[in-house]
Amino acid sequence: MATYFVGDLQGCYDELQLLLERVDFNPTQDKLYLVGDLVARGDKSLECLRFVKSLGNAAQTVLGNHDLHLIATALDIKKVKPRDRVDAIFNAPDFDEQIHWLRHQPLLVHSEELNFLMSHAGISPDWDLKTAKSCAAEVEQILQHGDFHYLIENMYSEQPDRWSPDLQGLARHRYIINAFTRMRFCYLDHRFDFACKSPLKDAPAELTPWFNLDNPLYKQIPIVFGHWASLVDEPTPKGIYALDTGCVWNNRMTMLRWEDKQFFTQSAVKNYSDF
């Protein structure tokens, strides 16, 4: 039995299958964890959704920002982004089933047995483990069982950009969603910056990656995340695993076998910018 993590798919189905073949993935014995953004700019988003869903308990994903945007478009809250290739999802006979399944995926996965935390973008520098788990559960409860339409309709905001336990209502839920699905750089006072998406060497001096801020949790439990393709080949602190290596940007897809921390990579098999 082996445990695998894989970076953002973004509709890059062929590369995922090549990686699974390479490691001889067996869904009756092995487990696949995905860091979110199953869909978007690649040409096989529907295949990615169907495949991960078909694995049942052999796979677990978390919600990424592109996954949430797909749900928003399915609810007629947002329009499909011009670069997203998701028409096949909207035309599929199992469209409602796929969106329902996606909406019921978590923002955070914590395994005590395997000793890891996984989310799409990371863990807020102001949260301990208890806070991270309770915040994720708050929003998951609404997405799965509450007024999810109202939440998704009102989640698009960059404020508040700093955590406070006194945050309530939509402000609180926006921060939680942004922390788990959009966070990259922060100011030293832990405020989020959503404008900068550049490689670390090109970032303004006042900004630092969230994982370089002082949070004891970052050293207590290994954290697996995706979302940040420009981190490719950048060193990260011990126990911080950045798995988005920009396959949809014509780079590569990365898989991590947890038991021995061995990485496997698959170069993009097509030029996605040509579509």
From Swiss-Prot:
<dbReference type="Pfam" id="PF00149">
    <property type="entry name" value="Metallophos"/>
</dbReference>
<dbReference type="GO" id="GO:0008803">
    <property type="term" value="F:bis(5'-nucleosyl)-tetraphosphatase (symmetrical) activity"/>
</dbReference>
<comment type="similarity">
    <text>Belongs to the Ap4A hydrolase family.</text>
</comment>
<dbReference type="InterPro" id="IPR004617">
    <property type="entry name" value="ApaH"/>
</dbReference>
<protein>
    <recommendedName>
        <fullName>Bis(5'-nucleosyl)-tetraphosphatase, symmetrical</fullName>
        <ecNumber>3.6.1.41</ecNumber>
    </recommendedName>
</protein>
<keyword id="KW-0378">Hydrolase</keyword>
<comment type="function">
    <text>Hydrolyzes diadenosine 5',5'''-P1,P4-tetraphosphate to yield ADP.</text>
</comment>
<dbReference type="InterPro" id="IPR004843">
    <property type="entry name" value="Calcineurin-like_PHP_ApaH"/>
</dbReference>
<dbReference type="InterPro" id="IPR029052">
    <property type="entry name" value="Metallo-depent_PP-like"/>
</dbReference>
